[in-house]
Amino acid sequence: PAASFAAVATQLLADGARVLVVGDDSDVPAADEIVAGARGAVSWAGVVDLPDLAPLLSLADLVLGNDSGPRHLAAAVGAPTVGVFWVGNAINAAPLGRQRHRVQVSWTTHCPVCGVDATQVGWTAPRCEHDVTFVGDVRVSTVLDDVRAVLASTR
């Protein structure tokens, strides 16, 4: 959730980091929420096109993000990452090493609204209509610990 990313960004800004939020046009509302909650963070969401994103990410000391294209792209261009993954996606797509990449996993397996078992969607269960986060149980403190640990080991 954007509020959690804002909380991490606030702590990193207090540590002296510079925080840049990126994403496509659909990410602008969340980026705006992050920047509003973390004074000093800057949003380029909806501004940086995909061809320009790879070189930008390669310059980052660290990229924090959900299990998303930009987080995977950051890892591909050599940037250290901390990713927030839902358990089903972590099994298939999370990085395995821990020195340059860390993974925070949400173990939520059922929709918090209707209870549909998300591990069976596409197999025995239809997708529910609720647009809710499945990573809300990932704690800000553990993400921040991983961010600081990766930064310390890669600088």
PLM regions and their residue ranges:
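Donor-binding and catalytic core of enzymes assembling or modifying cell-surface/extracellular glycoconjugates
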Residues: 2-88
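Nucleotide-sugar donor-binding patch of glycosyltransferase catalytic domains
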Residues: 35, 43-44, 75-154
